[in-house]
Each structure stands twice: as structure tokens, then as C-alpha cells.
Amino acid sequence: MSRGLGDVYKRQSKDCPSFGGVYKLAAIQNKDGEFVPKIKISENIEKITNPGNKTIYRIYDKDTGKIRADLICFADETYDTSEDLLLFDPNSTWKKTRLEGGTYTMKEILKPIFIRGECKYTSPSVKEIASFCEQEKNTLWDETKRLFNPHKVYVDLSQRLYDTKTELLNNVNR
């Protein structure tokens, strides 16, 4: 019998039935260098992986500088902030928000550490990390920072990523 790390933790602790941050395969690079999306399915909808080679954009309100949402998309997707952007909850797709073009900004927040085995990242100093954390904390709405009943920062999927995920789920066991 083979076991994954999550299985061991699941059997060892009833208080903590899942173990986050475990590596999951998201894509396989084919002979042509293209990434073929793959998916891991779970009974728990939040644990179903998002397939493909991805990046993450943080979306800010242009006037306030506060975070509106994070958007997970394929690494080759680009966005024009002068155009409207439809965001939706990937688990409750009827929950939608339309951001009007020109009212938001976007910043890619995923930084490559290694590319083809070579380190491409210079680690910042502790002082720089503290400064960055303070700056990012200032982009959170007060409702998000409160300890009692805080609002959450929404993490949405691009339409293309959502469609790919849905297609892979629909093709399971076919």
C-alpha cells in the first residue's frame, strides 16, 4: 500500500484532517515544451487542484490602493486594466463582481525562484521583508484585518482556467 503525505497526517490527527502546502502535480511539459494541464480530484471541493502552468495577479482598487481580489490564471494570460473585468467565485459561480475598466490596477505577485534549475531570485533582507509586509498590510481593508468576523480576500480563477478545470473534471472516468 502506498500513502501520500496527506494520508498519513489525515490518519494521525482528527483535529487537523488535512495538510496544506503539499506539492501537487498541475501540468506535464510535453516534447514540444507545452504544458499539458493535469488535475487532482478530491471529495472536498477546495482541495481540487487548479490545473496548468499558472500565475497570480493581485487586483487593487485604483482610488484607494486596497486589495479587491487575487486572480489565478494561466501564465500566458494577460489583462488590460482599461477593460472591464468579470470576477466570480469558482465554487459559487453565481457570485460575480464586474470591475469597470480604469477603476483597478493589477500586479503579478508570483515570482520565479528557479528557472531550469538556476536560482533567479535574490532573497531580500529582513528589514526589506518587514517593510514589504507593512506596505502590503496597508492594502488590506479594515474589514479584512479585524479579528472578529473578518471579510476575506477573494481568490478567483480566470474564465479560461475555470473552463479548463471544468473540462478536466467532466472528462474523469471517460
Where are these regions (language model features)?
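Single conserved hydrophobic/aromatic residue that forms the stacking wall/gate
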Residues: 1-9
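Gly/Ser/Thr/Ala-enriched C-terminal appendages of enzymes
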Residues: 10-174
